[in-house]
């Protein structure tokens, strides 16, 4: 339910941006549900970041979301999720029905770097019985 509300909120924000062309209304951009985990989805998010005024040559905060049914699975994935600039933390998901492994860090949002993390984290989520739910980035100008 929370994911649906979050996606609806994202769509509303994108429409507001398109209508007003004001980048001040959006400070985070994330993938749409159908494109999560794909190279095309990563390209769409990077294009949205650029359209929102982000300087893609500057490091920004990125968050990758992995969900698990139980804490041991989330902890196991978190032990392998951190790589390079990324650090993993585990907490209850917002809807309290699952566990979130949040993988976060500062990096330059390049297509190659992001997609390599996406592929790795998607495989990690599947290997531990979880679900990869995409990434978001803060708009840094």
Model-predicted segments: where are they?
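Long, contiguous binding/interaction regions
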Residues: 2-141
């Amino acid at each position: 339910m929370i994911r649906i509300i979050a996606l609806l909120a994202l769509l509303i924000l994108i429409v507001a941006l398109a209508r007003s062309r004001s980048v001040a209304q959006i400070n985070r951009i994330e993938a749409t549900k159908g494109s999560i985990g794909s190279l095309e989805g990563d390209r769409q998010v990077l294009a949205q970041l650029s359209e929102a005024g982000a300087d893609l040559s500057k490091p920004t905060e990125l968050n990758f979301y992995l969900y698990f049914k139980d804490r041991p699975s989330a902890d196991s994935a978190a032990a392998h999720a951190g790589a390079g600039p990324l650090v993993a933390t585990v907490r209850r998901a917002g809807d309290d029905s699952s566990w979130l492994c949040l993988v976060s860090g500062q990096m330059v949002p390049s297509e190659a770097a992001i997609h390599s993390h996406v592929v790795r984290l998607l495989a990690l989520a599947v290997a531990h019985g979880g679900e990869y739910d995409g990434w978001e980035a803060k708009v840094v100008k």
